[in-house]
Amino acid sequence: MTHPYLARAWAKTGADLRVPAPGQAKKVALLGSLDHAIRELVVHTSPTKRSSDFIAHLEQLDRLYGPRPGQPFTPVVLVEDNGPIHTSKLALAALAARAHWLTVEWLPKYAPELNDIELVWRDLKAHHLAHQTFADPDALDQAIHQAVGALNDERMAYPLAKLRISA
């Protein structure tokens, strides 16, 4: 959003935690995938959050991880929640078209605590994008991509001793 996200702010009980900011509040939708092997976050931003935006993110994953002619490919597992943009007819058809290399594991409904990327979103908002205002959605979009780059650099600089296995 173009208005600031307030992380760890203090106020009296019942008080409104809004910071006055010029203009209207606009949002930028953020779709992403976390590559556990190299700890890289891959994001797609859009002014909307629709099935077509999810498919654009799948096409981004095609370019990064999809099979290439004449080369062996490594199967990929994509962990998804049951959000409407992931379960629409259009999205399910796009996932089915990639079934030869992309396996989808569905999380239970209303279980964000099981989705590792939710922790990344929280970190991105609280540590990289908090307490800032943006002139317009394009400035926010640019800040998101810079923050993701910084987050990826930070995660690459301090690798895990062993990979986390979600089960």
Can you name each region flagged by the protein language model?
Residues 1-60, 165:
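Extended, low-complexity cationic-aromatic segments
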Residues 15-22, 96-119, 133:
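RNase H-like polynucleotidyl transferase catalytic core
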Residues 32, 39, 58, 81, ...:
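Mobile genetic element proteins and their domesticated derivatives, centered on retroelements
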Residues 58, 72-87, 110, 115:
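Acidic/histidine-rich, metal-coordinating catalytic segments
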Residues 60-71, 145:
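Structured catalytic cores of enzymes that bind and process phosphorylated ligands/cofactors
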Residues 89-93:
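Distinct, well-ordered alpha-helical segments
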Residues 117-167:
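C-terminal anion-handling pockets and recognition modules
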